[in-house]
């Protein structure tokens, strides 16, 4: 699906991709920025918990992934776009994101030329245009009071002052559309799957006790939960074009020392999900086991030693996700706030036996097919 993301950005954006990504790496990794993001994530999660637990008895059952999806979206909009986008456009931007998610992977993008106005293409074009209109309007509004926004910590305020990106404001809408895709799906999956894994009372109690005595960033078990969720449920595919021929050795038991040559120009897809479930690499590969990270705190580093990439929830090398710190921070804060505030119970018609399979249709880690109804209880 990542091959079709060019359908949701305006022409010319990818010519400036390197500048935009460089600005992102700098802008969201500053200490003050991460502290602000942590505050936003905690505030939004607290508001969400209040809403979930204050519903009337008949309305308490909610769709878990859908609820976490809107929560993460609100955090992303406040952190990356700013309070003005949040106050005026947060719901509309969410609806636009969902429409784009539903249409970006259409088979028609593959079998028809890019200029053919088929249904999914038209819907993507309309969404792209509306996002651009929102950004054009909000940036004009900011120009009226530049001093008010100069010291803000949202990412747009940074890019407007960064010499590498200040002159590229016409591409901000496209840039943030891609960021919504990149930051949203996998963060939602991380939080939601951790919450579903609460079915182990021992793990839930252990996390609560640890959070009661440790600062969030010093909680080994919370860190282990995030790492194991990234291993067990990671599904984003890394797609690359081979720039030159490359010969690789393949480990096929029936063909010793077998090799394969990848021709120049070949599209190569790497599956973190299959890598993370390889029994030759991981003990109990198909079992969700956060304790593995407590038994060996250096496990992530060891898995990628010697040029081997066996743990890649955020990619690797020059293609490693620049938003890794932000995504982990949001996931940890959301989980910590929820686990310290309420319990999670099955909702109407849902149980462990009714859970569907994994939904790999999104850009990022898989969600649960059909979602699941849950109740957040004080």
Swiss-Prot record:
InterPro entries, alphabetized: Cyt_P450, Cyt_P450_CS, Cyt_P450_E_grp-I, Cyt_P450_sf, Cytochrome_P450_monoxygenase
Top enzyme class: oxidoreductase
A GO molecular-function descriptor: oxidoreductase activity, acting on paired donors, with incorporation or reduction of molecular oxygen
Induction cue: Expression is positively regulated by the cluster-specific transcription factor pytR.
Known cofactor(s): heme
Any Pfam family: p450
Metabolic or biological pathway: Secondary metabolite biosynthesis
UniProt EC number: 1.14.14.-
Phenotype seen when the gene is deleted: Abolishes the production of most pyranterreones, but accumulates high amounts of pyranterreone 5.
SUPFAM superfamilies xrefs: Cytochrome P450
The keyword tRNA-binding belongs to this UniProt entry's keyword annotation: no
UniProt keyword annotations, A-Z: Heme, Iron, Metal-binding, Monooxygenase, Oxidoreductase
Cystine pairs: none
UniProt: heme binding residues: 321
Its biological purpose: Cytochrome P450 monooxygenase pytD; part of the gene cluster that mediates the biosynthesis of pyranterreones, a family of antioxidative compounds. The first step of pyranonigrins biosynthesis is performed by the hybrid PKS-NRPS synthetase pytA that condenses 4 malonyl-CoA units ato the acetyl starter unit by the modular PKS of pytA. The acyl chain is then connected to an L-serine through the amide bond by the modular NRPS of pytA. A tetramic acid is formed and released from the PKS-NRPS pytA to give pyranterreone 5 with the help of the thioesterase pytI.
Entry similarity comment: Belongs to the cytochrome P450 family.
Protein name from the UniProt record: Cytochrome P450 monooxygenase pytD
Species annotation: Aspergillus terreus (strain NIH 2624 / FGSC A1156)
Lineage, highest ranks first: Eukaryota, Fungi, Dikarya, Ascomycota, Pezizomycotina
